[in-house]
Amino acid sequence: MSYVIDRRLNGKNKSTVNRQRFLRRYRDHIKKAVEEAVSRRSITDMEHGEQISIPGRDIDEPVLHHGRGGKQTVVHPGNKEFTTGEHIARPQGGGGGKGPGKAGNSGEGMDEFSFQITQEEFLEFMFEDLELPNLVKRNLTGTDTFKTVRAGISNEGNPSRINIIRTLRSAHARRIALSGSSRAKLKEATVELERMKREEPDNFGDIQELEVEIDRLKARIRRVPYLDTFDLKYNLLVKQPNPSSKAVMFCLMDVSGSMTQATKDIAKRFFILLYLFLKRNYDKIDVVFIRHHTSAREVDEEEFFYSRETGGTIVSSALKLMQEIMAERYPSSDWNIYAAQASDGDNWNDDSPICREILTKQIMPFVQYYTYVEITPREHQALWYEYERIGEDYADTFAQQQLVSAGDIYPVFRELFQRRLVS
């Protein structure tokens, strides 16, 4: 039995280009299906793709054909039923099927076209047109990254980067240049030898001299090396500076006793979606997790999402801790600072004005964007209205939205992080 081993880099995805073209063509259908899937799934259930269905009528290719009206003169093969000049009734129009009623044995149609998109494609459509607002490049000394780019051909380089086509082309050109005169003389001598053998077969001396000359020319041509170090050509790769934007996202989650388990679950889902978005779209970004009730603590990812600690409610404790961490580790001159806060809006009454004061004086002047989501089906409380006053002063860098159920998470998330036009 014979085995064929496919060593091509893209062997198992030979139609990758066609698939990408298909995804671009039906982007609207796929995007709508992804949005429906996100609202249907749990936010944590993002480990697989999605089955997409496109109506058959939407994948039909446009074709040119004759219209159904008008008169036509057609010559048909001879038959026993009709003679010259007879008129044939026009067939009744209609679709392929027989319409309502009993099943028939004729007619045809097309089912919906279904296909599977991968997890990577699913996330690409899920986070399409989303970005961190106001992201700018900071002047960072010594923190530039580099990317390797093609920069033409070089005569020196690493053997692993040899350009075979350019090398063989150079070798061929060199051999032609060095042996060109010898090949021309060899051609002339060969023609002369054939003429003498044909017209002067008895002139052994001249014939022998020509044969010796031909052998000498062939030897000279063979001495030209097939490949020389001069011929070697390498793909030149250079490092190009790639200034990076350093960013940090502060995640502030209320875990006080007023937050029911359902409310906490919605908050966690919102932050899971945010964390997934950040890690997929940005290579260099720090995420600081802060949980708070009457006091605030910086925690790791595991504790942020799964700790069961609870208590009273003093929102300003989280804002004070965020300001301290900013001053200690993330100066605004070097970092793009973002924050996302989730709460049910329930706060100690005297603390809400303090939150507005801390945000207005110590946080908002130094951040690129601050988002607040309030998870409650009830009327807003004092904290929401204090934050509304902040939004009036910082319309471009502050946003607040309300979440009522888990189905609101994705639409609100897109609203908060929708890509904006730069004027």
Curated annotation (Swiss-Prot):
> What is the protein name stated in its UniProt record?
UPF0229 protein PSPPH_0628
Task: Mark out the compositionally biased spans (Gly residues).
Answer: 92-107
**UniProt region (Disordered), positions on chain:** 65-110
Q: What does the record list as coiled-coil region(s)?
A: none
Which NCBIfam families does its entry note? PRK05325.1-2, PRK05325.1-3
- The signal peptide annotation in the UniProt record is none
HAMAP family tied to this protein: UPF0229 (MF_01232)
Extract the Pfam families matched here: DUF444
Report the family membership: Belongs to the UPF0229 family.
